[in-house]
A protein has these predicted regions:
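Active-site alpha-helix of zinc metalloproteases
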Residues: 45-46, 67, 99
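Short, hydrophobic transmembrane alpha-helix segments
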Residues: 24-35
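Structural signature of hydrophobic alpha-helical transmembrane segments
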Residues: 36-44
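A feature for the membrane-embedded catalytic helix bundles of lipid/isoprenoid biosynthetic enzymes
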Residues: 2-14, 18-21, 41, 72-225
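Aspartate-rich (DDxxD/NDxxD/DxxxD) Mg2+/diphosphate-binding motifs
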Residues: 54, 64-68, 75
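Conserved G/P- and acidic residue-centered "switch" motifs that form tight phosphate/ATP-binding loops
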Residues: 50, 71
């Protein structure tokens, strides 16, 4: 496999994740219990595919800064797709996607500024300055914890929508006695996910202060004659 084709493999995985996220919300929108069930499975698949492109890139020897940026962009799109949909479906308050999206735009803006200075979000050229901020933003533990919390939130919200479809058909997915517990778990997962999202975003802004408050150099030839 030549190098150009090798680059396509992880990029196709990234594109596939985004496409499956759209398919999942499309299925959740249908008034069908089987469709909702398939959507919940797809949510798990989409989140599980998060690190697959990176694994393939390392195995094929085609890791690049562009690939890392593309992966982060796909993460944002997938997150926003689900949060916006669940807000529209009245499963979460509108404040959730507003907070998540605001954090995403701010963090990605400062990361873009750091990238212009040769710094990356993760890896050897990371923009993170201290061990604490590197732990919060780039450690495997925090990334896995955030991934698990997102998966739990999206799956539980999807199950609640599947339950609504089942109720409309005169049945149920979750025993009625356990429905209240499921709703509470979903609410908790959402709050924890938002909190982790902010906890991983604030350090990025703090560690990029040199780029945010950089004083522009005067243009050459400027000054009084």
């Amino acid at each position: 496999m030549n190098q150009r084709k090798s680059y396509r493999v992880p990029n196709l995985v990234i594109a596939g994740r985004v496409a499956l996220a759209f398919v999942a919300v499309g299925l959740l929108s249908l008034p069908s219990l089987p469709a909702a069930g398939v959507a919940v499975v797809l949510i798990v698949v989409v989140i599980a595919m998060d690190g697959l492109d990176g694994i393939l890139a390392r195995k094929l020897g085609v890791m690049s800064d562009f690939g890392a940026v593309l992966d982060i962009t796909a993460d944002r799109i997938v997150e926003h797709i689900f949060w916006i949909y669940f807000a529209v479906a009245h499963q979460v308050g509108v404040w959730v996607p507003l907070v998540i999206m605001t954090r995403s735009f701010v963090v990605d803006t400062v990361r873009g500024m750091a990238f212009a200075h040769g710094k990356t979000a993760f890896g050897g050229a990371t923009m993170m300055r201290s061990s604490v901020t590197r732990f919060l933003t780039a450690s495997r533990f925090m990334r896995n914890l955030y991934g698990v919390s997102k998966t739990a939130a999206f799956v539980l919200l999807g199950l609640l929508m599947a339950e609504a479809r089942a109720n409309a058909e005169g049945g149920f997915v979750v025993p009625p006695a356990a429905l209240g517990a499921l709703e509470s778990l979903a609410d908790l997962a959402v709050v924890v996910t938002v909190a982790l999202c902010l906890a991983r975003g604030v350090p990025v802004v703090l560690d990029s202060r040199d780029y945010l408050f950089e004083r522009p150099e005067p243009a050459s030839g400027s000054g009084n004659a």
